Amino acid sequence: RVKAIGEIGLDYHYEDVPREVQKQAFRMQMALARELDLPVVVHEREAHEDGLRIVDEFPDVKGVFHCYSGSLEMAKELVKRGWYIGFTGVVTFKNARKAVEVAENIPLDRILIETDCPYMAPEPYRGRRNDPSLVPFVAAKIAQLRGLTPEDIGKATSENARRLFRIEEGK
């Protein structure tokens, strides 16, 4: 059974697809999510303002901004609107000040953890192929930042994923 639509969104990093084309496609995908009553997994890279503007056009569509790279201010705006923030191994990197700040400061019930496989492997595996077996490193880092245990983070993020994707416990 389909649980979400994604990965959809905007990526202005390489500029290989015109921004207007990306925005049009994103709006069409958000409209489909609304029609099907499904959450979305949003990829947004270097397109923070446009990404927020478009999700605001669809207030009844919710989801996760995966592999989050935006500011704490934007994360707070997304959380206010009912969105989740996805963290990858980036949060373990020494130079990941923004990701750390967001992970420390948004509500635990809005955090998801992920691989973004095959990219974004956490320290000490940075630069290698990522896979699901490395997600505990992400949980451990967020736990350390928040003064919790990795088990606390695992339990909370599992519940968050079940809630977002409407998965019954035990399935």
Regions found by a protein language model. Give the residues of each.
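Divalent metal-binding pocket/active-site signature
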Residues: 1-81, 93, 101-102, 106, ...
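Rossmann-fold dehydrogenase core element
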Residues: 110
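Conserved beta/loop motifs at nucleotide-recognition and modification sites
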Residues: 116
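Active-site phosphate/pyrophosphate- and oxyanion-stabilizing loops and adjacent acidic/basic residues
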Residues: 100-101, 140
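His/Asp/Glu-enriched short active-site or ligand-binding loop at hydrolase and phosphoryl-transfer sites
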Residues: 82-96
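Mid-to-C-terminal alpha-helical segments outside catalytic/metal-binding sites
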Residues: 32, 133-171
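Amphipathic alpha-helical segments at domain termini/boundaries
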Residues: 120-122
